[in-house]
């Protein structure tokens, strides 16, 4: 896989209450990824960026909600999430990533 493509696959870590609970319980980290990212690409990107070993990747697509803004109807964007399970002894510290 192209290293340039792998650098663009992961958009941002997801730091929510649910994602933190999953991280503590299942040793998984949640990321927002591009819409056309595949599981092997996500695995390779996490291993390249964070220098950790990935055990598995679970992906979900979330459809954007329709929201009203006064009399105008708008829509939030669709989102693709990846839950990355790390091998035993591996950990990602977002404070040290450059």
Swiss-Prot record:
Name of the protein this chain belongs to: Large ribosomal subunit protein uL23
Coiled coil: none
Superkingdom of source: Bacteria
Record-level GO BP terms: translation
Gene Ontology MF annotations: rRNA binding; structural constituent of ribosome
InterPro entries to which the protein is assigned, alphabetical: Nucleotide-bd_a/b_plait_sf, Ribosomal_uL23-like, Ribosomal_uL23/eL15/eS24_sf
Gene for this chain: rplW
NCBIfam families: PRK05738.1-3 (NF004359), PRK05738.2-4 (NF004363)
Pfam families, A to Z: Ribosomal_L23
Organism placement in taxonomy: Bacteria, Pseudomonadati, Pseudomonadota, Betaproteobacteria, Burkholderiales
């Amino acid at each position: 896989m192209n290293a340039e493509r792998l650098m663009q696959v992961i958009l941002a870590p997801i730091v929510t209450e649910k994602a933190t609970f999953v991280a503590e319980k299942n040793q998984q980290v949640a990321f927002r990824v591009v819409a056309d990212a595949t599981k092997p690409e996500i695995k390779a990107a996490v291993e390249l960026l964070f220098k950790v070993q990935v055990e598995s990747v679970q992906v979900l697509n979330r459809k954007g909600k329709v929201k009203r803004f006064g009399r105008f109807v708008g829509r939030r964007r669709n989102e693709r999430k990846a839950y990355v399970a790390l091998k035993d002894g591996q950990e990602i510290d977002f404070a040290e990533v450059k």
